[in-house]
């Protein structure tokens, strides 16, 4: 039976303190990945036109690889971090399809293997260890599990969690038909703000 793995809050804090010292665009990708709770492939293939504004709220369009496309509301702070990432890419590479692009080939997005390699290098260099004293084994999917765990701890309904995580299930589809983006923005605002606060204070250092 597969067991979900979670990082403790202390481990996440320690890991992020060092992530912020990495290449700034790689750091932005990893922070956004945590804040959005998306699959890493969804984060790395975010497009430069993924943001929209409706009723004074930011929404992000997430196009899951070989799957569904969906939108969810995000905080102004996350939107500004995305805009900053887009501006960085445009300044260095001109107009591109993706927000996070390879330096040697801006037509293509970041690759997960590159991201994991760079983070593991950083973990070994800084000797980052888990609660058992073992060298931290990094996997971006663990961030996603932590995001989902935070939602369940806040007693959010399963269908709302599925929506926020971009899961495609019959139960989720049933509820998607009943709920509009405006209601989604209102009902999840407190949840998203609590999750956002884990990282946004440190992100301000990039301003």
What are these model-predicted stretches?
Residues 32-33, 60, 79-86, 119, ...:
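Short, structured motif recognition centered on aromatic/hydrophobic residues
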Residues 63-68, 165-193:
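Catalytic-site neighborhood detector that most strongly recognizes the C-terminal catalytic loop/helix
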Residues 43-44, 148, 155-167:
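Active-site-proximal segment of tyrosine recombinases
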Residues 31-35, 44-56, 165-170, 179-181:
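Amphipathic alpha-helical scaffolding segments
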Residues 24, 41-62, 78, 90-98, ...:
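Extended intrinsically disordered, low-complexity coil regions enriched in Ser, Thr, Gly, Ala
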Residues 26, 132-154, 172:
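Short basic/aromatic active-site micro-motif
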Residues 7-40, 144:
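Basic, Lys/Arg- and aromatic-enriched nucleic-acid-binding interface segment
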Residues 54, 63-109, 118, 122, ...:
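Basic, alpha-helical nucleic-acid-contacting "clamp/cap" segments
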């Amino acid at each position: 039976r597969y067991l979900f793995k979670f990082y403790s809050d202390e481990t996440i804090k320690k890991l992020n303190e060092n992530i912020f010292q990495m290449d700034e665009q790689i750091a932005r990708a990893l922070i956004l990945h945590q804040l959005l709770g998306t699959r890493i492939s969804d984060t790395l293939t975010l497009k430069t036109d993924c943001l929209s504004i409706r009723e004074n709220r930011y929404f992000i369009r997430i196009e899951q690889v070989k799957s569904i496309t969906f939108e969810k509301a995000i905080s102004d702070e996350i939107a500004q971090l995305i805009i900053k990432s887009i501006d960085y890419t445009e300044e260095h590479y001109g107009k591109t399809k993706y927000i996070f692009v390879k330096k040697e080939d801006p037509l293509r997005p970041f690759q997960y293997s590159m991201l994991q390699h760079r983070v593991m290098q950083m973990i070994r260099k800084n000797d980052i260890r888990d609660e058992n004293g073992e060298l931290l084994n990094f996997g971006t999917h663990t961030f996603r599990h932590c995001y989902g765990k935070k939602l369940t701890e806040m007693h959010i309904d399963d269908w709302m969690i599925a929506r926020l995580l971009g899961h495609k299930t019959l139960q989720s589809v049933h509820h998607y038909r009943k709920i509009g983006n405006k209601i989604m923005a209102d009902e999840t605002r407190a949840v998203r703000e609590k999750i956002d606060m884990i990282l946004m204070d440190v992100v301000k250092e990039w301003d």
